[in-house]
């Protein structure tokens, strides 16, 4: 995180939530928990449906704002958890008024809007964070620490058809999480993009696949579906370097396995003792004198959205640039737009 200059400097950050839909209510719940722990002041909620806002306000003991102006006046920072079509207008208004903003993904409807938001945030010296929650999943933090030379990445993000986010396709709804993760993880320019997809239940693509090639030789294959009978959020990474490995991780369960070639100096007896102590570990195969070992990975489980909102509050309080800044999110958004463009051109 880099230091930025802020226009408001309060010991206790006052936060509000715009939008009380399925995700907005989770923002409200977590801010209420953080407020109870003394980490933030939860000022209130706003929704175009006043009755809904009043319900959540009563539940959490905060104000139900009668207008956006009232919400802004009572806040240092705001979570925008509203339909994508409203993100640009709301974020622009709040940033211009010197408020720090966390806007849910996708950041905006188009690239020009995203660029403008980044410029306004910089001009007003405000924090602009985008809700790519998977970056705060302990799974991603673990992956960053062990797979230092990714060569091939495969992601699957599947879910049943949602009652929300039908204003956008599955690339902007689901795949964008994996685009953001892969870009942050690989840290190399994308040299080519190939996207395919089809609509099933909506006018936009409901199933999509994208293949990305990077300048450093890494390849990523991403699949997203919102018409799946099951839910899945998994990433698999083949990594080179000193310790060649294959890592299979589950974002939802926050668990997984690492498959690696046992070192030549790793004696059979000590290896077997280690495997016996580790649950679900095993020697999965042996060939040419080499042994492939499967080991469970040590991931400390936590709630990604809570970690994301804590990070936002910390950035506002300490005047830091967030890990998922507007500029960072725009890179994923640009890729998502290119993939959807290719799909619509089919």
Positions of PLM-derived features:
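C-terminal helix-rich "cap/oligomerization" subdomain common to oxidoreductases
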Residues: 1-9, 77-80, 297-299, 307-346
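A contiguous active-site-proximal alpha/beta segment in oxidoreductase catalytic domains
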Residues: 108-165
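Rossmann-like dinucleotide-binding domain that binds NAD(P)(H)
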Residues: 162-230, 234-238, 242
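NAD(P)-dinucleotide binding in Rossmann-like oxidoreductases
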Residues: 200, 219-307
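N-terminal Rossmann-like dinucleotide-binding module
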Residues: 2-59, 182
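Beta-loop-alpha module in the N-terminal Rossmann-like domain of NAD(P)-dependent dehydrogenases
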Residues: 27, 60-118
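Hydrophobic residues in well-ordered beta-strands that form the structural core
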Residues: 66, 103, 128-130, 249
């Amino acid at each position: 995180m880099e230091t930025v200059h802020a226009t408001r400097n309060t010991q206790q950050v006052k936060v509000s939530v715009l939008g009380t839909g399925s995700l907005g209510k989770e923002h409200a719940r977590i801010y209420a928990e953080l407020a109870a722990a003394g980490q933030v002041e939860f000022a209130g909620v706003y929704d175009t449906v006043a009755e809904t806002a009043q319900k959540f306000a009563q539940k959490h003991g905060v104000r139900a704002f009668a207008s956006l102006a009232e919400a802004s006046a009572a806040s240092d920072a705001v979570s925008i958890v509203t339909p994508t079509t409203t993100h640009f207008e709301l974020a622009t208004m709040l940033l211009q008024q010197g408020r720090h903003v966390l806007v849910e993904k996708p950041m905006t409807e188009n690239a020009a809007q995203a660029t403008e938001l980044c410029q306004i945030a910089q001009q007003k010296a405000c924090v602009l964070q985008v809700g790519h929650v998977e970056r705060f999943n302990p799974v991603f933090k673990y992956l960053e620490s062990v797979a230092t030379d990714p060569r091939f990445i495969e992601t699957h993000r599947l879910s049943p058809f949602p009652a929300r986010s039908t204003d956008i396709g599955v690339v902007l709804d689901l795949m964008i999480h994996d685009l953001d993760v892969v870009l942050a993880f690989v840290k190399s320019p994308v040299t080519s993009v190939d996207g395919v997809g089809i609509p099933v239940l909506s006018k936009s693509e409901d199933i999509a696949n994208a293949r990305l090639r990077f300048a450093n030789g890494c390849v990523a294959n991403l699949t997203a579906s919102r018409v799946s009978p099951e839910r899945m959020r998994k990433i698999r990474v083949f990594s080179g370097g000193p310790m060649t490995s294959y890592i299979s991780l589950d974002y939802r369960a926050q668990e997984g396995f690492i498959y690696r070639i046992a070192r030549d100096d790793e004696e059979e007896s000590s290896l077997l003792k280690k495997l016996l102590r580790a649950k679900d570990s095993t020697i999965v195969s042996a060939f040419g004198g080499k042994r492939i070992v499967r080991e469970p990975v040590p991931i400390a489980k936590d709630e990604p959205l809570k970690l994301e909102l804590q990070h936002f509050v910390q950035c506002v309080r300490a005047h830091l640039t967030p890990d998922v800044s507007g500029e960072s999110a725009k890179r994923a958004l640009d890729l998502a737009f290119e993939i959807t463009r290719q799909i619509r051109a089919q």
